[in-house]
Amino acid sequence: YKGRHSPWLSVIPPKNVAIHWHPQFDYSRYVADILIIDRATSTLGWALASNIPLIYIDSHHSPLIPSVKKEMEKSVFLVDAHELNWKKELTKYTSMNTKKMLDKWMLMKPSRDKFISKYVLGSSSNDSTDIVDWILTRKPI
């Protein structure tokens, strides 16, 4: 996005980390060891669907709603870029042993499933059907 400042620009990643700034995400998300994103857009849904360990950077450019953040912390590896030591926290995750990261990732699965159900997939009701029914049953003024 024009004018967007990625938190990654101020971080020197470990040698084992390769940054792809504009990947073909629909394919590349399945071959990564970890995914790092910093915006809760449709990309979040794509990343979660891959079941690849996800590091989410909560930045001041696109802050999470506090209640969502609280649930996300239990679901993915969350780094709060509002904190002074956020770069250290990010480096801790990117330097983590792969097996250890996968083990922690799997422990978060029940919370992540709830998070996905609530915030990514949305309501279980068919809202569009409800709206159409409402429109069709309204009496003209």
Segments from the language model and where they lie:
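Catalytic binding pocket for nucleotide-activated donors in carbohydrate/polymer assembly enzymes
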Residues: 4-16, 34, 39-123
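Amphipathic coiled-coil/heptad-repeat helices and related helical stalk/stem segments
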Residues: 20-22, 40, 127
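Short acidic alpha-helix that forms the nucleotide-activated donor recognition element
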Residues: 22-32
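C-terminal alpha-helical cap of glycosyltransferases
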Residues: 116-141
